[in-house]
Amino acid sequence: MRIAILSRNENLYSTMRLKQAGEERGHQIDVIDTLHCYMDITSNNPMIRYKGEELPQYDAVIPRIGASITFYGTAVVRQFEMMGTFCVNESVAISRSRDKLRSLQLLSRKGIGLPRTGFAHHPDNIQDVIKNVGGAPLVIKLLEGTQGIGVVLAETNKAAESVIEAFMGLKANIMVQEFIEEAKGADIRCFVVGNKVIAAMKRQAKEGEFRSNLHRGGSAQLVRLSKEERATAVNAAKVMGLNLCGVDILQSKNGPVVMEVNSSPGLEGIELATGKDVAGMIFDFIEKNAKPNSNRTRGKG
């Protein structure tokens, strides 16, 4: 099979592992810089050009779209879909997952466990929003933040008001969430491929930190999931319409709650923590499912 990986950096661990795993299976793998693709949007003859040449017809595309280029990246994926190419994650599913508020609303609609969350536009509503999520300590998040950036733990209501007012003064979109204290700075990353959790790791925040992201200095180890945690991760992926994703879960006193669904999860942490060939399992899925014109919109909203 001829397979394209959409990635801005061919030297990233995830990109290199995917290329290696694909080539070991006899596939031709091309790494394509998403931002260097440009589209010829013509009726009944969609085309993508790259560095002055028309791209060949691929059997499958693996999108590795960074958050900062979501708009352009999803347009490129959509163009591949119009050309009949199988895309591991569809453009609409990537767009859903990148909008944190939209994601939570869709998950909520399907009854999936979530931390209590508030969202408001006007400062007059701040105190009531804080009250509705249970008061401090609480977590304030920028909707556009990634890798733990733009996430603040407010330990008092007064501190929460000050942080929210500051963000609103900067015209930033934020949401306010209850702090799951019983999680003790740990979360679980479930790696879902084709409606199945293929690997999972527990990430622990470093001492004095509440964000468990590995980019923030957290550590990771293999974890055995409960049936409820496994079902929560798979259902969250289905709601988003993602064939491949990382679902981040906290263990709360009311059961597992979903914090985020990541449409472009990194492979390094999960492969090192679990010892599993995650890249190879992704190609297992592609080999079974990649057929021309087989993209079907999954999920709603």
Swiss-Prot record:
Residues 104-287 form the ATP-grasp domain. GO terms for biological process: protein modification process; SOS response; translation. One of its GO terms (molecular function) is ribosomal S6-glutamic acid ligase activity. Mg(2+) 1 binds at residues 248, 260. The keyword Manganese applies. Its EC number is 6.3.2.-. ATP binds at residues 141, 178-179, 187, 211-213. Binds 2 magnesium or manganese ions per subunit. Mn(2+) 2 binds at residues 260, 262. SUPFAM superfamilies: Glutathione synthetase ATP-binding domain-like. Pfam families: RimK (PF08443), Rimk_N (PF18030). Mn(2+) 1 binds at residues 248, 260. Keywords: ATP-binding, Ligase, Magnesium, Manganese, Metal-binding, Nucleotide-binding, Protein biosynthesis. Its cofactor is Mg(2+); Mn(2+). NCBIfam families: PRK10446.1, rimK_fam. This is Probable alpha-L-glutamate ligase.
